[in-house]
Amino acid sequence: MARWNVCSYCGKPFEPGTGKMYVRNDGRVLFFCSRKCERYYFMGRNPRKLKWTKAYQEARLQRGGE
């Protein structure tokens, strides 16, 4: 069975054959589950400031749950 990918921006797992794989010039591979995640990454948006990302939820737990 194929391995599920995890979005490099929002942290959501998604099925193989969906999403997009982006390879940077330095060889780092980024996976995006949606066009929304891809756009936000290239616009430089911080995933820790967006409530729908896993990074936000993890940062919130570290701060004490506010």
Curated annotation (Swiss-Prot):
Gene3D superfamilies: Ribosomal protein L24e. Binds 1 zinc ion per subunit. One of its GO terms (cellular component) is ribosome. Its cofactor is Zn(2+). Belongs to the eukaryotic ribosomal protein eL24 family. NCBIfam families: PRK14891.1-1. Part of the 50S ribosomal subunit. Forms a cluster with proteins L3 and L14. Binds to the 23S rRNA. This is Large ribosomal subunit protein eL24. It comes from Pyrococcus furiosus (strain ATCC 43587 / DSM 3638 / JCM 8422 / Vc1). The gene is rpl24e.
